[in-house]
């Protein structure tokens, strides 16, 4: 069967924070396609402020997900507008928001943007949470600016360069 829903790591995390009543802003880029207005409307319905969503030419980021008979998923990330987010604009947005206490990031945008935003956060005593999806090796300098790292089992294997077996977990 086919279903379409809103998502992306950053969007899902912002929506949950908004639904829980947190003062939540989404800093992102969306394309000039059919997903733009639907996504902005969804954020607004879920108590996520959209003042700092930039609209750029081209497609929005999408991620078709296939789930096999064993419940394992396969995700193809098509970055689209996500690749156009700019660290200077993101940091400027944080300054305009003011009094930011928490930043949540993820690897579906360019890592250099995460680097700069998380360095800004560390300099300004802002707590950071990083969801390393899609999984990739993370630079030690970047990790120094991460307060909470929340990988799933596959991402943990990639980050730690370890097979996640019972024996390795118990070591």
Where are these regions (language model features)?
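A glycine-rich helix N-cap at a beta->alpha junction
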Residues: 42-57
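Conserved phosphate/ATP/ADP-binding segment of small-molecule kinases
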Residues: 123-171
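Surface-exposed amphipathic alpha-helices with a cationic face
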Residues: 18, 115-123
């Amino acid at each position: 069967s086919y279903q379409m829903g809103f998502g992306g790591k950053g969007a899902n995390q912002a929506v949950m924070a908004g639904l829980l009543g947190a003062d939540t802003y989404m800093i992102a880029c969306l394309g000039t396609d059919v997903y733009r207005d639907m996504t902005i409307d969804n954020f607004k319905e879920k108590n996520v402020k959209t003042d700092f969503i930039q609209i750029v030419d081209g497609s929005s980021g999408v991620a078709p997900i296939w789930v096999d008979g064993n419940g394992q998923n396969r995700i193809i990330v098509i970055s689209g507008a996500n690749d156009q987010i700019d660290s200077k604009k993101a940091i400027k947005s944080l300054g305009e928001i003011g009094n930011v206490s928490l930043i949540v990031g993820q690897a579906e945008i360019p890592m250099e943007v995460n680097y700069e935003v998380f360095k800004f956060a560390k300099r300004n005593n802002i707590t950071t949470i990083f969801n390393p999806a899609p999984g990739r090796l993370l630079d030690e300098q970047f990790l120094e600016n991460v307060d909470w790292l929340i990988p799933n089992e596959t991402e943990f294997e990639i980050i730690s360069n370890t097979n996640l077996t019972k024996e390795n977990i118990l070591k």
